[in-house]
C-alpha cells in the first residue's frame, strides 16, 4: 500500500480546504485481497464524490474537527472548487480508492455507518493547538485501519474453504484468529494404546499396595483422615452437602506365603547349610545340643528370655494401640481388642507369692526391667477393672522388692497414674489385706518393709493414696466402724504413723500427690499417741 501523496480537500468558499504535503502523507493500512498482482500503474481519480453541504459532509465528527483545526488561516477561501482533487498517484486500485472515498466521505443521502456503541465527538483542541507548528502530524481514526465487515466476512469464508480442502486440516485443531503462536503439536502423542496405558497404571497401583498402610503410607492416611474430618465439620455446619472425597484405591492382590527352608538357630552367627538334593542333611542334625557348661549358665540367660518375652508382648501392645486409630466399627474393634488384651494379661498373670524373695516369678521379672514397667503402664488402660485391680494388689504386696530392684532404673513412678485410677475400685477388705503385707516383719530383720516404701517417691505416693481411700470408705460407710476390720485398720494407721515418726525428715521422700483428707487423720493419730 503506497502513501497518499498531495491529498487536497477543497470545498465551497464557505467551507474549508486542507492541503497535505507529500512528505507528510498518510499511510493507509487497508488493502483488498482481490487486488490484482499485475497492476503496476497508479490509478488516480480526478473527480471525487461530491460533498454536499447539507447532510453532514464528513462521515465522522472527529474528522471534521481535525480538518477544521488544522487549516491554515491564510488558505481559507483560496480554492473555490466544488470538488475534492487528489494530486499525485495514489498507488492503489480503483476499487480500493472508491471504498476509501465512501468510508471517509459518505454521501448525504446514505446514512452514516457506525459499528459498535456511539462515541461522543472528541474535543477539537486535542488534535491541534495554536502553539503547534505547521504542519501537524495527523493519524487516521481506528475504523480506517480495519477491514470492512463485508470484506472480513469474505476473507473468513475463504480461510474456512481452504481448511476443508486441505487433507491435514481435519487432524490439526483450528487455530484462533487472534493467536499469533502456531498450534502446538505433541511429538509423543499416540505412542501407547489405551490397553498399554491401563497395564502401566495397574503395575503402578500394585506397587502402592500395602498390608499395613498406616506404617507404609502414614502421611497419606493422616491427610485423608483430616480431610474427612473437615468435610464432616462442614456437613454439621450446613455449609455443603455430603460428598465422597477422592481416595486412592489400590487393587488387592493376595501375596503368596514365603516358605523358608533354611534352618535358623538362635544365637548362631552364620547361616546353617540348606538341605538340597545334592547335599542331603537332616534338619535334626542342625539343632544345637546344650552342654553341661551351658546349663550352669541358665541363670544368666534368664534375663535374655525375659527381654525377648517383653519384646513380643510390646509388639502385641502396639497392634492394640493401632487398632484404636484404624477407624473400624466399634463392635469389631471391641471384640478384637478384648481378645488381644486377654492374651497379654494371661502372659503376665501369676499366682500370688507369699515369699518376697521369689525371683522366678514372671511378673516380677517383667517389672524388674524398665521396658517392662512401660509395658504394664501402657497396658493398664486397656484392662477391665477386675484385672487391673488384681495387678494393683500384686504390685502393692511386692512393693518393697520392686523398689529395691528399681534403684538403677527409677521407672516405677510411671505406674502411679495408671494405678491411681483403679484405687477407687478396691473394697475395704482388699485394701486391708494389701496394707497388712507392708507391715509384716521379714525373718531375721527388725525393720518393717514400710520403711523402705516411705523412702521411695513411688512407694510413699502409692501408700498415701491407699490410706486416703481407706479413710473415705470408713467415713462413708458407718457399718464399718463397728466391725473388726475397722479396729484392724486403726491399728494399721497407727503403725504407719509410728514408722513415719521414727524416720528422719530428710529420709522421707516427697510424694507425687498428697491427698487432702490425709492431714486431719494424721493429726488425730499423732495426738492420740
From Swiss-Prot:
Gene Ontology biological process terms in this record: deadenylation-dependent decapping of nuclear-transcribed mRNA; negative regulation of cytoplasmic mRNA processing body assembly; negative regulation of translation
Compartments in which it is found: Cytoplasm; Nucleus
An example Gene Ontology molecular-function term: poly(G) binding
Major subcellular site: cytoplasm
Disordered as annotated region, ranges: 153-183
GO CC, alphabetical: cytoplasm; nucleus; P-body
Keyword Chaperone: no
Alphabetic keyword roster: Cytoplasm, Nucleus, RNA-binding
KW Nucleus (keyword) present: yes
InterPro entries: Pat1-like, PAT1_dom
Function: RNA-binding protein that acts as a translational repressor.
Subunit comment: Interacts with LSM1.
PANTHER family: PROTEIN PAT1 HOMOLOG 2, TOPOISOMERASE II-ASSOCIATED PROTEIN PAT1
Family: Belongs to the PAT1 family.
Name of the featured protein: Protein PAT1 homolog 2
Gene transcribed to yield this protein: Patl2
Amino acid at each position: 500500500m503506497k502513501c497518499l501523496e498531495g491529498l487536497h480537500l477543497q470545498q465551497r468558499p464557505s467551507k474549508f480546504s486542507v492541503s497535505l504535503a507529500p512528505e507528510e502523507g498518510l499511510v493507509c493500512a487497508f488493502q483488498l485481497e482481490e487486488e490484482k498482482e499485475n497492476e503496476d500503474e497508479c490509478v488516480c481519480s480526478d473527480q471525487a464524490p461530491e460533498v454536499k453541504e447539507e447532510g453532514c459532509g464528513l462521515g465522522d465528527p472527529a474528522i471534521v474537527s481535525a480538518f477544521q483545526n488544522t487549516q491554515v488561516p491564510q488558505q481559507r477561501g483560496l480554492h473555490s472548487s466544488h470538488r475534492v482533487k487528489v494530486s499525485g498517484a495514489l498507488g492503489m486500485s480503483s476499487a480500493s480508492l472508491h471504498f476509501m472515498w465512501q468510508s471517509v466521505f459518505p454521501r448525504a443521502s446514505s446514512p452514516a455507518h457506525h459499528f459498535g456503541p456511539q462515541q461522543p465527538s472528541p474535543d477539537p483542541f486535542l488534535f491541534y493547538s495554536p502553539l503547534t507548528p505547521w504542519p501537524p502530524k495527523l493519524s487516521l481514526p481506528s475504523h480506517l485501519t480495519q477491514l470492512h465487515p463485508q470484506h472480513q466476512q469474505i476473507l473468513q469464508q475463504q480461510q474456512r474453504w481452504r481448511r476443508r480442502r486441505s487433507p491435514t486440516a481435519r487432524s490439526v485443531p483450528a487455530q484462533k484468529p487472534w493467536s499469533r503462536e502456531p498450534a502446538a503439536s505433541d511429538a509423543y502423542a499416540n505412542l501407547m494404546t489405551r490397553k498399554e496405558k491401563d497395564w502401566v497404571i495397574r503395575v503402578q497401583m500394585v506397587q502402592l499396595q500395602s498390608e499395613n498402610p498406616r506404617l507404609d503410607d502414614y502421611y497419606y492416611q493422616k491427610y485423608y483422615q483430616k480431610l474427612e474430618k473437615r468435610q464432616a465439620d462442614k456437613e454439621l455446619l450446613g455449609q455443603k452437602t455430603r460428598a465422597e472425597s477422592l481416595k486412592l484405591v489400590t487393587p488387592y492382590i493376595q501375596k503368596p506365603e514365603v516358605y523358608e527352608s533354611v534352618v535358623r538357630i538362635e544365637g548362631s552367627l552364620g547361616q546353617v547349610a540348606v538341605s538340597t538334593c545334592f547335599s542331603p542333611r537332616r534338619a535334626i542334625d542342625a539343632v544345637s545340643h546344650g552342654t553341661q557348661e551351658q546349663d550352669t549358665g541358665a541363670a544368666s540367660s534368664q534375663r535374655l528370655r525375659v527381654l525377648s518375652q517383653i519384646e513380643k508382648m510390646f509388639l502385641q501392645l502396639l497392634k492394640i494401640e493401632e487398632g484404636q486409630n484404624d477407624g473400624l466399627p466399634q463392635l469389631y474393634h471391641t471384640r478384637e481388642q478384648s481378645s488381644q488384651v486377654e492374651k497379654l494379661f494371661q502372659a503376665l498373670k501369676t499366682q500370688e507369692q507369699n515369699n518376697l524373695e521369689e525371683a522366678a516369678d514372671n511378673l516380677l521379672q517383667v517389672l524388674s526391667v524398665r521396658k517392662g514397667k512401660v509395658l504394664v503402664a501402657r497396658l493398664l488402660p486397656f484392662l477391665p477393672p477386675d484385672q487391673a485391680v488384681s495387678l494393683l494388689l500384686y504390685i502393692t504386696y511386692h512393693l518393697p522388692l520392686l523398689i529395691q530392684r528399681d534403684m538403677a532404673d527409677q521407672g516405677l513412678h510411671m505406674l502411679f497414674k495408671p494405678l491411681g485410677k483403679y484405687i477407687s475400685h478396691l473394697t475395704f477388705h482388699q485394701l486391708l489385706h494389701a496394707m497388712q503385707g507392708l507391715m509384716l516383719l521379714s525373718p531375721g530383720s527388725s525393720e518393717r518393709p514400710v520403711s523402705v516404701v516411705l523412702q521411695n517417691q513411688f512407694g510413699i505416693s502409692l501408700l498415701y493414696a491407699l490410706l486416703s481411700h481407706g479413710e473415705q470408705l470408713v467415713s462413708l460407710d458407718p457399718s464399718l466402724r463397728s466391725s473388726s476390720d475397722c479396729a484392724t485398720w486403726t491399728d494399721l494407721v497407727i503403725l504407719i504413723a509410728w514408722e513415719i515418726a521414727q524416720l528422719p525428715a530428710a529420709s522421707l521422700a516427697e510424694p507425687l500427690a498428697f491427698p487432702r483428707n490425709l492431714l486431719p487423720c494424721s493429726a488425730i493419730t499423732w495426738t492420740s499417741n
